[in-house]
C-alpha cells in the first residue's frame, strides 16, 4: 500500500474550528470554490473536510472511515506547469479503497477518456508476485461544473461495468462517479440525505454570505470556509489560485469560441441542406416541365414521331 505522504501543515481529521480565525461576514470570495487549485489545497490542508466530502460522495457515515490519506500531495504555493502538472487527488480510504478526485470547470470534451485513464492507472498497481484478487477497488469521482451528457442530465451519476443484456455487475472494483455542480436542482432524496446538494452549493458559492449560511450548522462546511480563508490569505497559494483562474478564463473563452463556431457550422450545414433541397425541387420541376413540353410537342406535330 502507498505510504502516508501527505504534505505538512495538514489539519488532523479531528480538527475543530474553535481556535481558528473568523471568516468575513460578507463580500465576494477572492477565489471561487470551483478553482481546481483551491479545491486541491483545501482537501490537502484539511483532512476533516476531505473525510466529510468522501462520506457524502460514497454515502458513508463518518464512523465508517478510519483513515483518508492523500498519496500524491503537492507543495502548496509552488508554481505549476500545465503541460506536466495535474490537480487530481489520489486518496487511500481505510487502507483499502483507492479514490481519485478532480474538479473540472471547463468542458474540454475529454472527460470520459480522462476518467477512464485515471481509473485504469490507479487499478494497475499490483506488485510482482501479488495475486489479482489483491487489487484494491478504485473509484474515480469528477466534480464537474457542466453537464457531461446534456441529453441525460443528472446531479450525481455512477457508472460501472455491466453485462449489456442482463445488467449483471462484472466487478465492483471499478467505478466512475460524476457530480454535476450545475444541476443541483436534480438532486435526489438520497443525494440530499447525504447533503451532496449542500456540498455542491459550497463549491458553487461566490460570496462569504453563502459560506456563512452553509456553515451555520455544519462543522465540515465551517472548517472548509475557514480553511479557504486561511489559504487565500497566503500570498503564494493565492497567486497560484489566481493563475488558475486566468488559465480557466482563457480556456473558457476558447470553449465559447469553439461552441460558437460549432453552432455556425451547424447553421451553415442546415442552410446548405435547405439550398440542396430547393435545388433538387427546382430540378424536379424543370424535368416535369420538360416532360410536359415534350408531350405537347408530340401532340402538335404527330408526323415528327
Please give the residue ranges for each predicted region.
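Amphipathic alpha-helical transducer elements in NTP-driven molecular machines
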Residues: 112, 138, 193-196, 218
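Short hinge/gating elements
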Residues: 35-42, 181-185, 210-211
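Generic recognition of short, well-ordered alpha-helical interface segments
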Residues: 45, 49, 191-194, 219-223, ...
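Accessory alpha/beta interaction modules
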Residues: 1-175
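Short helix-to-loop capping/linker segments positioned immediately adjacent to catalytic or ligand/cofactor-binding
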Residues: 126-131, 167, 185-188, 210-214
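A short, charged helix-loop
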Residues: 152, 157-190, 194-198, 205-206
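Short, charged alpha-helical interaction segments and adjacent helix-coil junctions
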Residues: 2-27, 99-104, 201-305
Amino acid at each position: 500500500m502507498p505510504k502516508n505522504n501527505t504534505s505538512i501543515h495538514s489539519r488532523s481529521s479531528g480538527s475543530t474550528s474553535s481556535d481558528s480565525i473568523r471568516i468575513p461576514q460578507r463580500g465576494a470570495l477572492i477565489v471561487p470554490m470551483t478553482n481546481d487549485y483551491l479545491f486541491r489545497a483545501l482537501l490537502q490542508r484539511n483532512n476533516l473536510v476531505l473525510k466529510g466530502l468522501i462520506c457524502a460522495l460514497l454515502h458513508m457515515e463518518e464512523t465508517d472511515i478510519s483513515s483518508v490519506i492523500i498519496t500524491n500531495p503537492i507543495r502548496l504555493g509552488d508554481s505549476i506547469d500545465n503541460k506536466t502538472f495535474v490537480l487530481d487527488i489520489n486518496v487511500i480510504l481505510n487502507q483499502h479503497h483507492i479514490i481519485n478526485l478532480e474538479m473540472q470547470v471547463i468542458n474540454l470534451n475529454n472527460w470520459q477518456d480522462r476518467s477512464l485513464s485515471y481509473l485504469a492507472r490507479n487499478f494497475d498497481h499490483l506488485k510482482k508476485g501479488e495475486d489479482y484478487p489483491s487489487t484494491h477497488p478504485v473509484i474515480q469521482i469528477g466534480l464537474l461544473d457542466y453537464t457531461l451528457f446534456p441529453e441525460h442530465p443528472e446531479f450525481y451519476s455512477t457508472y460501472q461495468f455491466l453485462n449489456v443484456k442482463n445488467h449483471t455487475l462484472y466487478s465492483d472494483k471499478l467505478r466512475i462517479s460524476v457530480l454535476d455542480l450545475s444541476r443541483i436542482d436534480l438532486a435526489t432524496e438520497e443525494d440530499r440525505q447525504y447533503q451532496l446538494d449542500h456540498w455542491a452549493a459550497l463549491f458553487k458559492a461566490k460570496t462569504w454570505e453563502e459560506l456563512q449560511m452553509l456553515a451555520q450548522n455544519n462543522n465540515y462546511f465551517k472548517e472548509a470556509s475557514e480553511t479557504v480563508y486561511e489559504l487565500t490569505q497566503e500570498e503564494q497559494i493565492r497567486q497560484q489560485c489566481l493563475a488558475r483562474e486566468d488559465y480557466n478564463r482563457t480556456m473558457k473563452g476558447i470553449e465559447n469560441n469553439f461552441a460558437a463556431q460549432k453552432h455556425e457550422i451547424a447553421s451553415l450545414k442546415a442552410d446548405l441542406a435547405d439550398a440542396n433541397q430547393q435545388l433538387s425541387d427546382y430540378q424536379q420541376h424543370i424535368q416535369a416541365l420538360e416532360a410536359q413540353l415534350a408531350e405537347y410537342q408530340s401532340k402538335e406535330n404527330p408526323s415528327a414521331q
